[in-house]
Amino acid sequence: MGTRLQGRVAVITGGCSGVGLAAVKKFLDEGAKVVIGDVNAEAGAALAEELDVTFVAVDVTDPDQVQALFRTAFDTYGSVDIAYNNAEIVPLDDQSILTTDLDAWRRVQEANLTSVYLCCQAALPYMLEQKHGSIINTASLAAVMGSATSQISYTASKGGVLAMTRELGVQFARDGIRVNALCPGPVSTPLSQELIDSDPEGAERELARIPMGRFAEPQEIAAAALFLASDESSFITASQFLVDGGISGSYVPPL
């Protein structure tokens, strides 16, 4: 058990699986009180039984439900110190701009970009009152580099998250609030496994361009989120925090 988040209250969306669940466990291990917001009510209820957490079933695209999530955190624990806005979707019908229809485009924008807007909007009043807080928004390597294996709406949504994060980080820097974009490269999660299964050739190409030769584990991305949530990153705000196995720094990956 550590103490890096001792006495802090953290809201983590998408906390029932993958990177979100890894972050829940890391934050708990470092002393935080954690509120999980997730659409999966069954998994959330099980985690509330298993771990010392509060679970709120939430559709992160619904303004009232998002407000209720953060209000629950404040009413239960007395503050909102950390918002890790991590919920996202990566649907199989989001591909090339030539084949992705408007419904798929809008669905991804709502889940990946509008949700972050709503969560920041809900968290900030508590943090302004407290005069401190850390917001971590899940962007992506796709926000800073183009990909030939396109997921057009996903890429655009994450670019929006990164731009919004920079603006909020600058706007609220003198209010004691830090806002950073966590930009993972490929991660081994149930979502990524779906994509691998649907396009094995694309997955092989993806793996070949990673200098470290593998996908990240959820715990590795969660460790970066923990750093950004803690006082160890006290002079970091409005940043793009890349955790990508060297992809963004490589021209030709090693053989």
Name each model feature, range by range.
Residues 2, 94, 226, 237-255:
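Short C-terminal tail/terminal secondary-structure segment
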Residues 9, 16-17:
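Conserved glycine-rich cofactor-binding loop
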Residues 41-42, 58-69, 102, 219-220:
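The beta1-alpha1 cofactor-binding region of Rossmann-like NAD(H)/NADP(H)-dependent oxidoreductases
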Residues 94-97, 101-106, 206:
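Substrate-binding pocket helix/loop in short-chain dehydrogenase/reductase
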Residues 120, 157, 165:
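Active-site helix of classical SDR
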Residues 125, 170-174, 234:
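Alpha-helical segment proximal to the catalytic Tyr-Lys
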Residues 140:
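Residue(s) in the substrate-gating loop at a strand-loop-helix junction
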